[in-house]
Regions:
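A glycine-rich helix N-cap at a beta->alpha junction
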Residues: 1-16
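Secretory-pathway/luminal and periplasmic proteins that interact with or process carbohydrate-rich
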Residues: 3, 59-60, 243-245
Length: 306
C-alpha cells in the first residue's frame, strides 16, 4: 500500500524489541510487579477444577468466569504452593464494586459496571506466555502509544484495560472505538460480500493508491466535495472529530470507480508495469481467487487479442 512505518521489527527503533516472543521477560517482570503491589495473585487451580466450574455455570445458565478461589489464599498458603512447585497462572484482581468510566473520542463517556467485567482474568499463563491483555497493556505503555484506535467490538475489553493501567499506576492512552465496516446488506463485511483481503484486491488489479484512498474515506470526512487524496494529504487532514459514529458501507462499485481514476492517471510505463503480471500470468495475477466471489474483475485497459 505504500505505507511505511517509522519503526518496527525489520527497521529497528527506540522502543524495541518489536516481536512479542522477544519480550517475555518484560511481561513476567510486570506481572510480578502487580503481585508485589497487591493488584494480582497466583492461581494454582487445576484444569479439572476450572472445567467443573465451567460445567456448573453452563448447566445453571450462570455468567462464565473464574470464581476467584485463589484470590483468598493466605501468604503462607501461596508460599507453600510455590515451594512445592505447583504450576500457577497470574490473575488480575479486578475491582468487584462500583463502576469504571472512560472517555471515547467517538462515543463520549462510557460507564461500565465492574460486576460485568470478566472476573480476574489470567495475565500470565503457566508456560510463561502472556495473555493478550497483559501484552497489550505493557507494549502500549512501554512504546508510549498515545491513542488506541480499534473496532467497537473491543469496547467490552476496555474497562478491564483501564483497570489494568490503574493497577500499574500508568495513565491510559486515549480511546477511539471505530464503527464496523458493513456490506451492502448492513451486516459486518465478510467473504460472502466479496473480496476482503489485500492479496485478493491486488490480484484483481486494484492499485494501492486506490485502496488507500477509498478505505480512508470510509466513515471519515475530509474536504467537502473532494474525493481523491494522496497519502500525505490524508495524513495531514485526518482528525478524530471527522470520524462518523455510524457504520460505513463497503461499496465495491465505488472502489472500482476510485481504481479507474488512478489507472487513467498512469503513464504508459506505469501502465505496462501494472498490467504485465495479468498479461504474462506471473506475479500478482497468479494469486488464488475464489471463483464464487461475486466481485467482478476491474477493467484495467482495452481488451487484448492476437
Amino acid at each position: 500500500l505504500g505505507i511505511k512505518w517509522d519503526e518496527g521489527g525489520d527497521k529497528g527503533g527506540e522502543y524495541g524489541p518489536y516481536v512479542q516472543s522477544e519480550r517475555f521477560e518484560l511481561y513476567k517482570k510486570y506481572a510480578q510487579k502487580l503481585i508485589e503491589n497487591g493488584e494480582a495473585y497466583y492461581c494454582f487451580c487445576a484444569a479439572e477444577r476450572l472445567e467443573r466450574i465451567r460445567k456448573i455455570q453452563t448447566e445453571n445458565k450462570m455468567a462464565p468466569g473464574y470464581d476467584r478461589n485463589c484470590r483468598h489464599l493466605t501468604p503462607e498458603e501461596v508460599q507453600k504452593n510455590l515451594a512445592e512447585g505447583k504450576p500457577y497462572v497470574i490473575r488480575l484482581k479486578v475491582q468487584k464494586k462500583k463502576k469504571t468510566v472512560f472517555h471515547d473520542h467517538i462515543l463520549g463517556d462510557i460507564v461500565w459496571k465492574n460486576e460485568d467485567i470478566s472476573p480476574d482474568p489470567v495475565l500470565l499463563k503457566s508456560d510463561g506466555f502472556p495473555t493478550y491483555h497483559l501484552a497489550n497493556i505493557v507494549d502500549d505503555h512501554m512504546m508510549k502509544i498515545s491513542h488506541v484506535m480499534r473496532a467497537q467490538e473491543w469496547i467490552p475489553s476496555t474497562p478491564l484495560h483501564v483497570q489494568m493501567y490503574k493497577a500499574f499506576g500508568w495513565q491510559h492512552p486515549e480511546f477511539c472505538h471505530l464503527p464496523m465496516v458493513n456490506g451492502s446488506d448492513g451486516k459486518k463485511l465478510s467473504k460472502r460480500h466479496g473480496s476482503t483481503s489485500l492479496n485478493e484486491f491486488r490480484a484483481r488489479g486494484y492499485l494501492p493508491q486506490a485502496i488507500v484512498n477509498y478505505v480512508a474515506m470510509l466513515g471519515c470526512s475530509y474536504e467537502e466535495g473532494k474525493e481523491f487524496y494522496t497519502l500525505d494529504e490524508l495524513a495531514s487532514l485526518f482528525r478524530l472529530e471527522h470520524l462518523n459514529k455510524a457504520p460505513a458501507v463497503f461499496d465495491y462499485k465505488k472502489l472500482e470507480y476510485y481504481n479507474g481514476n488512478y489507472i487513467r492517471q498512469l503513464s504508459a510505463e506505469e501502465l505496462y508495469k501494472w498490467t504485465l503480471p495479468f498479461i504474462t500470468g506471473t506475479g500478482d495475477a497468479t494469486l488464488e481467487i475464489n471463483p464464487e466471489n461475486p466481485q467482478p474483475k476491474p477493467n484495467v485497459g482495452p481488451e487484448f487479442s492476437g
